Amino acid sequence: MTLSFFVNMNDKVKEILSYVIIIVIVLLIKHFIVIPIKVNGDSMNNTLKDKDIMILDKISYRFQDIKRFDIVVIKKDKEYLIKRVIGLPGETVEYKNNKLYINNKNVAEKFNHEETPDFILEEKIPEGYYFVVGDNRPVSNDSRYIGLIKEEDILGKTSFVIFPFNRFGNKK
């Protein structure tokens, strides 16, 4: 196929072909790179609100490690959850007197405005697993109740709200 093939096409065929190419590109982007995702529930208040629409970045973790305090989207038992990564592989996690301790050292959290009940993860987090929680701890169904999250269940990270427009922007 040469360039002359496209030049000699009739305009209607060119138009249809351009739509097909656009659709293929959009589907590839949606499948491999980014997709919109909707916050369902109050477990990430005050950082994220119920019904916020965000961008899920599916590609970053192919090139960088999951970091503490990243906001991630998880697929758990046919349900999608949005939570914050607190514990990384090889670490111990403890909440005591409303303070986070990683490996027995206090780690400041600037996003948690709710009281967190005392909690101790008895063993180290194994390789390939993460401890995640919601920012609104009293209502969050997270690793304290559903267990550690497998790395392959983390679909990507998110922090950018695209709707509603009055909340547009990066929410870390």
Tell me what each language-model feature is:
Residues 1-81, 149-153, 157-172:
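Protein maturation boundaries and topogenic segments
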Residues 94-98:
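Short, solvent-exposed secondary-structure boundary/capping segments
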Residues 138-145:
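Active-site loop architecture of trypsin-fold serine endopeptidases
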Residues 82-87:
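Short beta-strand-centered aromatic/proline hotspots
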Residues 113-129:
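Acidic loop->beta-strand submotif enriched in PP2C/PPM serine/threonine phosphatases
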